Amino acid sequence: MVRLTLDLIARNSNLKPRKEETISQCLKKITHINFSDKNIDAIEDLSLCKNLSVLYLYDNCISQITNLNYATNLTHLYLQNNCIPCIENLRSLKKLEKLYLGGNYIAVIEGLEGLGELRELHVENQRLPLGEKLLFDPRTLHSLAKSLSILNISNNNIDDIRDLEILENLNQLIAVDNQLLHVKDLEFLLNKLMKLWKIDLNGNPVCLKPKYRDRLILVSKSLEFLDGKEIKNIERQFLMNWKASKDAKKISKKRSSKNEDASNSLISNFETMHHIVPVYYPQVGKPKLVFFSEIQRYPVNGNASPESSREDYTKIIEEMGNLSLKQSESLLTKNDVHEPHLFHNPKEKENLFAENE
């Protein structure tokens, strides 16, 4: 294995010291260091590289992030495909803009507090134990809320990304090959991320849900690319018109339902008030009996106001109430109402029909 030292950097540097120029002075001029795929397993003191801005250390065997405290001018750090289990010792890198940590053993996104200039964070393809997923420390998310614009969290067994709502300036999110399942969770997130114009969710179960693409396009006006496919204006406008038409139909249906319920309520109220009326059927030669018959129901005008309908009902009921039993009896004579089926004697039926003839 190889350790990254100042001597190694000096020997592999393209910078040639001038006469009477020391190695220290030469190292101060270095801005880019590329030791990718060199079997490096540790980082030694780089404090002399004061102007270092870009450091390439990907595809090595580094197991711990160390000795970068004095590289305060570092803006780009490439540490993907190493053996790093946790994010640490980076808080002094106040100018860091891009951090690449994909392909390591990181289980929690943490330790990035104080990196107020960090714009890109790449933590895809972490080699996690079976069944585990990548987690986010709320403190780190809060510290990156205003700066982070690009986030790559692909292939990390993630099933919920609603915590990312705090990243108010995020404009690109790559979350391919995770376990995202619910469209509603994505709608919630897109409602919060007002500057997001690109999101890639290919390889998630949610992509197979009905109307998945349509729903995300409708909920986000800023989105321009979804799963690698451009969202054209004509597509968005068509979906917006379709949704407006659907919403209008729902409103119309609700209004019709309310009107119908109001009409049914009026009819129900009428039925419960004096719904039976005494009717006399005098029998020939028998004691007079009183039968009760249901009042006839009349359709209610849907346009009539509830007040006028109640007045009509009250009037009908009052007229019925004024009809006394004696008046009802006097209005019906033997010859007016006949109920042959009530006679027990057949001769009485024959006499009755003979009188009518």
Curated annotation (Swiss-Prot):
Can you cite an annotated GO cellular component? cytoplasm
- Ranges in coiled-coil conformation: none
Q: Where are the LRR repeats?
A: 29-50, 51-72, 73-94, 95-116, 117-138, 147-168, 169-190
- Give start and end of each LRRCT domain: 204-242
Disulphide-bridged cysteine pairs: none
Ordered alphabetically, the record's keywords are: Cytoplasm, Cytoskeleton, Leucine-rich repeat, Repeat
Q: Which SMART domains match?
A: LRR_SD22
- Please provide, alphabetically and separated by semicolons, the GO molecular function terms listed in this UniProt record: actin binding; dynein complex binding; tubulin binding
UniProt PTM comment: Phosphorylated; in the testis.
UniProt-annotated location(s): Cytoplasm, Cytoskeleton; Cytoplasm, Cytoskeleton, Microtubule organizing center, Centrosome
Gene3D superfamilies for this protein: Ribonuclease Inhibitor
Subunit = Interacts with PPP1CC isoform gamma-2; the interaction is direct. Interacts with actin, dynein, KIF5B, KIFC1 and tubulin. Associates with microtubules.
Query: What does the protein in this record do?
Result: Regulates phosphatase activity of protein phosphatase 1 (PP1) complexes in the testis.
- The protein in question is named Protein phosphatase 1 regulatory subunit 42
Annotated organism of origin: Macaca fascicularis (Crab-eating macaque)
